[in-house]
């Protein structure tokens, strides 16, 4: 009997140790996985940095990944997040259509996904979709571009990736304004896939075919910087350039007279707000907000460029 009692006490002690271990795990910081198209691109890098800073401030562990606009790699990274038992995923996705299945996969196992910058072509799958008011921002940029062009002359439009809804929305916003000016004439419209090197090469070619151009309006700042490099190399510093994002590079180009304007979309704030909503959802089971949330953009010109730093106006 004494032996049985000792064995029972030992089993109870082991059970208590196991429970204590579970309690310790429960107190450990939960994991927030942050996935963006790139960690090297300044815009996406600031998204990741902003999300990471806020998540750590709120007590979460973090993992940062980039999918390189590859939907298959994005799906693999979602699998990694699932395998690591992530509490939530902050995602700037790899395509409106091609990302739906990946977001649904996370949802199916109970991991909420909070989208930033780019929306997907479905509702009710992501817990939140926090995007810039791309149409409003594009109209701001186009108005500044028209003014920089003196409301007349031939111009070029550089468009982003066709799979990214932001590219089409920004282009429509540009033309909502520019098409109202009868003396503005678009001589070329090409996709440079958000790439600085592609924009550089394409503007070089466009200059050979259309040396008369007076302006370049670009769907993001990376392409704008490629255009500026090509224009400067050709001795065409007289060509007006307007970008979209609010990067430090284009800020400096504006201050140096190499660009007319850019449009600031609040990358840092979007990412931090996504983490705040994720934390609220994990604590309360709801965000208290609509799924799609839109943040207005701001025009950056020489008048306020000095206040711009890391995609935020100080």
Model-identified regions with their sequence ranges:
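Short, low-complexity disordered leader/linker segments with a strong preference
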Residues: 1-31, 104-111, 314
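Hydrophobic alpha-helical segments within soluble ligand-binding/sensing domains
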Residues: 74, 130-155, 169, 198-200, ...
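Hydrophobic alpha-helical
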Residues: 91-107, 174, 192-252
């Amino acid at each position: 009997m004494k032996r049985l009692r000792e064995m029972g006490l030992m089993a109870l002690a082991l059970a208590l140790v196991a429970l204590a271990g579970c309690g310790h795990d429960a107190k450990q910081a939960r994991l927030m996985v942050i996935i963006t198209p790139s960690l090297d691109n300044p815009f996406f890098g600031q998204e990741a940095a902003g999300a990471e800073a806020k998540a750590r401030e709120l007590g979460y562990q973090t993992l940062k990944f980039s999918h390189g606009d590859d939907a298959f790699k994005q799906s693999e990274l979602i699998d990694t997040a699932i395998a690591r038992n992530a509490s939530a995923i902050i995602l700037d996705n790899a395509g409106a259509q091609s990302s739906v299945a990946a977001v649904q996969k996370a949802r199916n196992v109970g991991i909420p996904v909070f989208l930033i910058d780019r929306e997907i072509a479905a509702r009710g799958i992501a817990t939140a979709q926090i995007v810039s008011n791309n149409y409003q921002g594009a109209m701001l940029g186009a108005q500044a571009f028209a003014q920089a062009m003196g409301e007349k002359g031939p111009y070029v439009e550089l468009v982003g990736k066709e799979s990214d809804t932001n590219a089409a929305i920004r282009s429509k916003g540009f033309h909502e304004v520019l098409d109202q000016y009868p003396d503005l004439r678009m001589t070329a419209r090409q996709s440079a896939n958000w790439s600085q090197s592609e924009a550089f090469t394409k503007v070089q070619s466009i200059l050979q075919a259309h040396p008369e151009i007076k302006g370049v309006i670009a769907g993001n700042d990376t392409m704008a910087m490629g255009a500026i490099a090509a224009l400067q190399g050709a001795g065409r510093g007289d060509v007006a350039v307007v970008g979209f994002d609010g990067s430090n590079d284009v800020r400096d180009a504006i201050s140096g007279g190499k660009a007319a304007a850019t449009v600031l979309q609040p990358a840092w704030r979007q990412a931090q707000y996504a983490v705040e909503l994720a934390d609220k959802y994990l604590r309360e089971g709801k965000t208290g907000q609509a799924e799609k949330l839109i943040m207005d953009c701001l025009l950056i010109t020489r008048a306020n460029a000095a206040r711009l730093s890391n995609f935020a106006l100080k």
